[in-house]
Amino acid sequence: MSVFKRNGHDEAPPIDPAATKAINRLIEMPRAEFEQLVVDLYCALGHTARRTGGLGDRDFDIVIVAKTGQHWIVQCKQWRGAVGESVVREFYAAMLREHATQGAIITTARFTPKAAQLAQGKSIHLYDGPAFLQALQRIKGTLVLDTDEHG
């Protein structure tokens, strides 16, 4: 499931001003639009993905049937502050409940060291803002959000 390549979880690369601006746009976009952007990325990679919909924060936002037939779930977090271990713990419980073979938490922010540590050894992939932007650039071929309007 590691479709958004990253050089580890410990050291984050510096963020340039254009990336900071793009991350702010991701944070400000409507939740459904952000989730759909994630769905579109997985679909571009040949997987089948759909939003779960509904109001309020859930343990997961997207269900994926991988090209291999595996069942994955994804949680999206449009946060400015770091994502902590409680989010990872709740997400892992959802993975077990849903019988998901893989899971990903995608955020516009960062992950705390404890969150990253908790995800280690589990089938949970963590993608922070810079890693998600890199995926957008690599998979979609553009920053996607590098114009003044994103809607």
Describe the predicted segments one by one:
Residues 1-58, 63-151:
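Mixed-charge (Asp/Glu-Lys/Arg
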